[in-house]
Design a protein with these regions (language model features):
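Short N-terminal segments immediately surrounding and downstream of signal-peptide cleavage
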Residues: 20-34
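Mid-length scaffold segments of soluble, non-membrane domains
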Residues: 68, 75, 81-143
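N-terminal signal peptide c-region/cleavage motif recognized by signal peptidases
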Residues: 11-17
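Amphipathic, well-ordered alpha-helical segments in soluble domains
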Residues: 38, 42-46, 68-75
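Positively charged n-region of N-terminal signal peptides that target proteins for export
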Residues: 1-5
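Beta-rich strand-turn-strand
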Residues: 62-65
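Membrane interface segments of multi-pass transport proteins and intramembrane proteases
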Residues: 42-60, 122
């Protein structure tokens, strides 16, 4: 495992830049963004709008379920980032919510004071000093960076569903998760002005930095950047 980690960093750190605003593929990224927008407008958004009409308690339960599936990924990456205390917290959350919380549909752990964290292998690479590389807009999957794109196979391997379900069920779960996430963003478009591509890019980069730094020293910059795009 340690050899794998060393090779992974050695190969990719040689060409991943730490430049936070690099977008050398902007022309291609914008075309991909347009494709994603059309897909969203014609399929994802209508489904998300239908989902928004579900009873709040059901939506909360579904959100809790998918949050619980991410706990194992977070637990492993907390360990890789040298955060043993947080990793124990996250593993405990997973055990409690999976058992007492009926498969994760009820967030019992939060009710007893166990705070939820979100970590992935992309953040772990950042903590290890691997630069983010250029900004990339992925078809269907949306905004990313080269570092986060290369980290996806590891994150997929750490996914609970990767090991516990058939491929078609795994795909179905990912689809439901995407719709659940999209439903939370309904209405944001009406608050934006200017170049939506730039907004999405800046929002993604700022959110990524916020997660990497655990919210330290980036919140004010994030708010200032978002103000530039919001309609008065």
């Amino acid at each position: 495992m340690r050899v794998f980690i060393f090779i992974y960093i050695f190969i990719f750190s040689s060409f991943l830049s730490s430049d936070e605003t690099k977008d050398p593929f902007e022309n291609l990224n914008r075309k991909t963004f347009e494709f994603n927008e059309n897909l969203d407008e014609n399929f994802v958004m209508p489904v998300a709008e239908a989902y928004s009409k579900f009873p709040p308690k059901i939506k909360i339960g579904i959100s809790n379920f998918f949050n619980n599936l991410e706990e194992v990924d977070t637990f492993v990456n907390q360990l890789l980032q040298g955060k043993p205390k947080q990793s124990i917290n996250d593993l405990t959350r997973f055990v409690i919510n999976t058992t007492v919380g009926l498969g994760g549909f009820i967030d019992v752990a939060s009710k007893i004071g166990l705070e939820r964290h979100e970590e992935d292998f992309g953040q772990t690479l950042a903590v290890w000093g691997v630069g983010q590389g250029p900004y990339i807009m992925l078809p269907v999957l949306g905004p990313s960076t080269l570092r986060d794109t290369l980290s996806r196979p590891v994150s997929s391997f750490l996914s609970v569903t990767f090991h516990m379900t058939e491929t078609d069920v795994n795909i179905a779960l990912k689809g439901i998760d995407a719709i659940e996430t999209r439903e939370k963003l309904l209405g944001i478009e009406s608050l934006l002005s200017g170049d939506k591509y730039s907004f999405v890019k800046d929002a993604y980069i700022q959110s990524m930095l916020y997660e990497i730094k655990d919210g330290i020293d980036v919140q004010d910059d994030f708010i200032d950047d978002m103000d530039d795009f919001l309609i008065d």
